[in-house]
Amino acid sequence: DNTVIFLFRHGERCDRSDMPCYSDKSGITITGTEKAQQEGIKFATIFSEYDIYSSNAVRTIQTAKFFSGKDPVVMDSLSDCNNDLYKTLESIARESHKRNIVIMTHNHCLSFLARDRLGKKFKPAYLDALIMHYDGTRLILDGKYNKEA
């Protein structure tokens, strides 16, 4: 049994869209909230039990709330899109006791992980995700989460 970590890019940014905002420009659009909610409902049909985390950005926190219907655990370190991110992910995985983990993060974090672990370019769209697992000693990046499966 491994801890599985799903790292999602946040919903549609309000400051880069002409769509109506859910709150202010630092958050996500109303369309972003609807898509996050739809994605969360779909996800919960496959993975009913999971813990939800978010970086400290308004857009990731809003996405996490609409995705899960719960307040996420907010961690500033989930915005560190460099080698420090691995320490944060390992810490979350160790404390999870083999539960599924969903993390709302940023496109540059996902791009960093794909480049660093797989040597691949990854330009995630809103709500695209990568899957990792923690085998008790190390983090392994499995690839892109196929939402259509």
Regions found by a protein language model. Name each.
Residues 12-14, 93-96:
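A broad, low-specificity signal for short, low-complexity segments enriched in glycine/proline
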Residues 83-95:
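...with weaker cross-activation on analogous glycine-rich loops/strands in unrelated enzymes
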Residues 1-77, 81-86, 110-111, 116-149:
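Active-site-proximal alpha-helix that buttresses catalytic centers in soluble enzyme cores
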Residues 45-47, 94-99:
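Glycine-rich phosphate-binding loop signature in dinucleotide/nucleotide-binding domains
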Residues 3-5, 96-105:
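Generic beta-sheet signal
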